[in-house]
A protein has these predicted regions:
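Conserved two-metal-ion catalytic palm core of "right-hand" nucleic acid polymerases
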Residues: 1-135, 143
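Conserved polymerase palm-domain catalytic core
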Residues: 23, 30, 99-200, 204-221, ...
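Short, conserved aromatic-histidine micro-motifs
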Residues: 35-39, 193-200, 272-284
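Right-hand nucleic-acid polymerase module
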Residues: 57-58, 66, 154-161, 166, ...
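PAPS/PAP-binding and catalytic site of the sulfotransferase fold
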Residues: 68-71, 220, 224
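Surface-exposed helix-capping loop/turn segments at secondary-structure junctions
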Residues: 78, 189-195, 228-232
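A short, aromatic/hydrophobic, helix- or strand-capping loop or linear motif
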Residues: 80-84, 151, 229-234
Length: 325
């Protein structure tokens, strides 16, 4: 059911779904006789939120990979994860990361007030610069020989060369959240960083001493260099806690009384206004229904409502209603 979610409209998926028993039986036979071969992926272009290359795989390959990921790979490799490794995991995700960040900010405020800085580390080209040997070495530590061989066969079929992955695959996402697991433990256990959070390749460290943050940044850079990464100097910064900072789509500010405010950044608001204009224009031309446009708008409101956005949602709602007049 999970594998066909979002792609049931495709003719190939419909055919597989109608003949599911025969198709699955055929897959099992090939796996048992050792004649299974991974299908070649088809390159696609992903346009939102930014243009990038991706891969599309056949449903039978998706089922096979999902079985490995859910039953062996993820359970084996996620046992060592720290709680503040927040991306792409059961019971975690972007909302969990935001809650953890607010907890870290509150705990820091209780001890140091507004005295402190926030270090934000962004890795340059995380997936495009991901070394294949580093990923395989990570998987090797947690998998038995047969599963490790199956995983390597999948990765080698989908990705040629020695560097770079596309982030669409579930297996590659598992690689993304696990490859920096050693860095997480190094920061927490060797550097004794108390307020540390990572969402995929976006790292947050909160500390009352700016010089200590500079030292931590140097140590993080050294660790990243060992596995072929470098930091994005344009996005990596140290910001005074009193000024606020942007993380995962929201601007975080701590008031003098310790209240933590979450507001959408201006780029998100500007983007939503333009998107609403396009949706209403398409609906008026009959290319989509008004219900579809309303659904997209409600989805944005639900996300905005996770922060302190009551007045903003009211303004954008009025703006959206005016577009229909």
């Amino acid at each position: 059911m999970k594998c066909k979610r979002g792609v049931l409209w495709k003719p190939a998926t419909k055919h597989f779904n109608l003949n599911a028993v025969e198709e699955v039986h055929r897959m099992v036979e090939k796996l048992e006789t050792g004649t299974w071969k991974n299908g070649q992926p088809r390159p696609i272009s992903i346009l939102y939120p930014k243009k990038r290359d991706g891969l599309s795989i056949m449903l039978k390959d998706r089922i096979y990979q999902r079985s490995i990921n859910d039953n062996v790979l993820y359970p084996s490799i996620s046992r060592s994860f720290i709680i503040d490794n927040c991306a792409c995991q059961k019971g975690k995700g972007i909302d969990f990361a935001r809650k953890r960040l607010k907890k870290h900010l509150w705990n820091h405020y209780c001890k140091h007030g507004l005295n402190g800085h926030v270090l934000q580390v962004d890795i340059k080209g995380y997936y495009p610069n991901m070394r294949h040997d580093a990923v395989k070495a990570k998987f090797r530590r947690y998998l038995n020989d047969s599963v490790y061989k199956a995983v390597c066969d999948i990765l080698d079929t989908q990705y040629v060369g020695e560097v770079g992955y596309n982030p669409g695959s579930q297996m590659v996402q598992i690689a993304g959240i696990s490859l920096l697991d050693d860095l997480d433990h190094y920061c927490k256990e060797r550097l004794h960083v108390k307020h540390y959070l990572r969402y995929m390749d976006d790292i947050i460290v909160i500390h009352d001493d700016r010089n200590e943050l500079l030292r931590i940044l140097t140590e993080i850079e050294k660790h990243l260099e060992k596995i072929g990464f470098s930091i994005n100097k344009e996005k990596t910064c140290i910001t005074p806690l009193s000024k606020g900072f942007t993380y995962l789509g929201f601007v975080y500010r701590v008031t003098s009384t310790g209240k933590i405010l979450m507001t959408l950044n201006s780029a998100n608001i500007k983007h939503e206004r333009k998107k609403l204009q396009r949706l209403v224009a398409l609906a008026k031309d009959g290319k989509i229904t008004k219900e579809k446009a309303d659904e997209c708008f409600k989805s944005w409101c639900a996300n905005a409502g996770k922060g302190n956005s009551y007045k903003l949602i009211k303004r954008i709602t009025d703006y959206y209603n005016d577009l229909w007049r």
